[in-house]
């Protein structure tokens, strides 16, 4: 048996009446755990190889805690707590970063992102949607939709209310981890699987999808769509949009460089380089025709926005007289042409 793993985590979760997993909570996921940890836990769990999600008992949890006592105190303490659980326990061991094949594996991948152990696009999430059941997220936790009506009636008969916060495949991140050094005004707007860097503020209108996020510090008052990563020091204005890889059929990975500003109700469908500004209300798609202006405001040429992807120090604006989309730079016409040629 190989003693190297891509990831290892001990979790407690929720199953429906058919004992199918609805969700899993991993308090302390590990990325590339030491060979000593793997060697200590594998025999107790009966793990041999590959990517597996193995259920274990309270008795095994005590054994695992004892085995890790002199190797990893934090994991040992966690397992001692898990041994007291009334809910089902699962150990997920990933030998490699392959596409997830179970709900427990999918949840571990999402935890790795939100615990800042990996960045967006750095972990394989292929085929994750069918592995995440659509469940009711309630004040008593995850509930299978087929069991919801009965539980709602049961609560009412006891004079109580079963409150449903959302019906979705993804829970909110803060029910699983709150990364250090962040502010999130409305926690329902940040999904598990988001990477929220230290110093990030997500205001009420901000939204961060899974496999997306921020380097931090930064202010997010707009939408960070799936697959989008925002560089440090960048601000997304109220109601602005970043085009995700899940919508529109595009496969271009949209990113926002460092020190950028996307104005209120603006949007981007191209990757932005460092120190770019997009005027409020202006949505730039890859095919948008852009009048490129030099430092003297003279027209250099008209290009498609995709030709400016990743270029630094650009100001995108709309001409208030004729409606043309313009891009102002601090470069000469010669420098602009050289930059475009190098980019192509």
Curated annotation (Swiss-Prot):
Pathway(s) served: Amino-acid biosynthesis; L-lysine biosynthesis via DAP pathway; LL-2,6-diaminopimelate from (S)-tetrahydrodipicolinate (succinylase route): step 1/3
Give UniProt keywords alphabetically: Acyltransferase, Amino-acid biosynthesis, Cytoplasm, Diaminopimelate biosynthesis, Lysine biosynthesis, Magnesium, Metal-binding, Transferase
Say if the entry is tagged with keyword Transferase.
Answer: yes
**Top-level EC class, please?**
transferase
Name the catalysed reactions.
(S)-2,3,4,5-tetrahydrodipicolinate + succinyl-CoA + H2O = (S)-2-succinylamino-6-oxoheptanedioate + CoA
Residue numbers binding succinyl-CoA: 223, 238, 241, 264, 279-280, 287-289, 304, 317-320
Which residues does UniProt mark as catalytic? 221 (acyl-anhydride intermediate)
What is its subcellular localisation?
A: Cytoplasm
What biological-process GO terms show up in the record?
diaminopimelate biosynthetic process; lysine biosynthetic process via diaminopimelate
Question: Where along the chain is Mg(2+) bound?
Answer: 205
**Pfam families membership:** Hexapep_2, THDPS_M, THDPS_N
Has keyword Flavoprotein? no
Transmembrane feature ranges? none
Disulphide bond pairs: none
SUPFAM superfamilies referenced in this protein's UniProt entry, alphabetically:
Trimeric LpxA-like enzymes
What does the UniProt cofactor note say? Answer: Magnesium ions are not essential for catalysis.
The record's function comment reads: Catalyzes the conversion of the cyclic tetrahydrodipicolinate (THDP) into the acyclic N-succinyl-L-2-amino-6-oxopimelate using succinyl-CoA. Displays succinyl transferase activity with L-2-aminopimelate and succinyl-CoA as substrates.
The record describes its quaternary structure and partners as: Homotrimer.
HAMAP family for this protein? DapD_type2
The protein in question is named 2,3,4,5-tetrahydropyridine-2,6-dicarboxylate N-succinyltransferase
Q: Which organism is it from?
A: Pseudomonas aeruginosa (strain ATCC 15692 / DSM 22644 / CIP 104116 / JCM 14847 / LMG 12228 / 1C / PRS 101 / PAO1)
List the taxonomic lineage. Answer: Bacteria, Pseudomonadati, Pseudomonadota, Gammaproteobacteria, Pseudomonadales
| Gene name linked to the record | dapD
